[in-house]
Each structure stands twice: as C-alpha cells, then as structure tokens.
C-alpha cells in the first residue's frame, strides 16, 4: 500500500460549438482553445510483488479550460463564453516490467471522471446562457518509469486523456445548445511512500 503526491504539467485542447435557437436566424459559433497549467494531486495505490500497480488519483480544485469572446446582436455587445473543470478522479492500472530490483518501466491505462461547468456573460455581466454542470468520463493512456529508494519511490510519466463530448441546452437566455470536446496531455512527476 502506498500514498503520494504528484505534480502535473497539463496541456489541454477544447473545441466548442454553440448553436443559438429561438431567434430569427440560427447561429453556429465554433472555437478551439489550447492552453496549459500546473496541477497537484494526491494518490493511493497498491503494488503487487511482480511490480504492477493499481491506484486512484485525485485533484481537488477548479481550472478554466477555455474562454472566448464574440460579438453578438442578440444580446447586443460582446459575449464571453468560458468553461471550467473540477475535481478529476482517476482509476488506473500500471502493468510494469522491472529492469532491475529498483527500476521499472510501465504502460498506464485507466478511466477518469471530472465535472465540466460552462457559462457565458455579456458586456453588462449578465448571464446570457447557463448550462448544467455535467460529469464527463475519459479514457487515460500513457507510459512511465519508476524508481524505488527503500520505502520511497519516484515516478515520471506521460499521459493522454480523451473525454466524452459535453452536450447540453441552456435553460435561460437564447436557449443555446453547446457541444464541447476536451483532450488533455500531461507530463507528471510523482513521489510516494510504501507502507
């Protein structure tokens, strides 16, 4: 049984499309945003005698993954749309090949869940469309290496995550429909302790 903490350099790509309804014309607004951020997480895991591992990783917090401004006549002025994600929880497995007693390499796979919350406001800071916060699932794949030092260990890994598409219709304002696709890439460094 092990516990640890990890630092992650996260790159994300978010592609969103908003379709407005209930107006004279139907507008489709599409934007793609990329960005990066630093995240910290905690994890618990169990390592088998052979070296392979199963575990859970949790990030406590919220991060903005996209923001764009467009000019609209309904409502008038600029409209700023944004989306944030919060509290990712990941279950993972690490099939491991130990090259020595203290050093091994592994493939990593798993599933993750997080909450996505989009919204948009106009120039008067009035919410023009509000969307339901929704849990999305994602598939995690990657690879890494681990090194043991007594009861301590260190890991370095690269991960990619592809999430389900977020789809929801606003219950206010223009009753717009939003669709968003989120993909992430992570470089992670972790330290842990074996009990």
Model-derived regions, located:
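Gram-negative outer-membrane beta-barrel domains
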Residues: 1-195
């Amino acid at each position: 049984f092990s516990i640890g903490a990890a630092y992650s350099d996260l790159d994300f790509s978010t592609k969103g499309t908003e379709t407005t309804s209930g107006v004279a014309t139907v507008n489709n607004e599409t934007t793609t945003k990329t960005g990066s951020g630093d995240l910290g997480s905690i994890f618990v895991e169990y390592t088998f005698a052979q070296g392979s591992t199963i575990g859970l990783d949790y990030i406590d917090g919220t991060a903005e993954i996209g923001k764009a401004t467009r000019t609209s006549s309904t409502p008038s002025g600029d409209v700023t749309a944004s989306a944030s994600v919060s509290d990712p929880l990941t279950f993972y497995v690490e099939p491991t090949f130990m090259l020595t007693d203290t050093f091994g390499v592994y493939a990593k796979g798993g599933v993750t869940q997080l909450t996505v919350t989009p919204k948009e406001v106009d120039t008067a800071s009035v919410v023009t469309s509000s969307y339901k916060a929704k849990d999305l699932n994602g598939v995690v794949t990657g690879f890494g290496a681990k090194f043991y030092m007594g009861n301590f260990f260190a890991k370095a890994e690269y991960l990619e995550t592809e999430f389900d598409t977020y789809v929801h219709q606003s219950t206010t304002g223009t009753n717009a429909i939003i669709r968003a696709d989120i993909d992430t890439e992570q470089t992670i460094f972790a330290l842990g302790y074996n009990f």
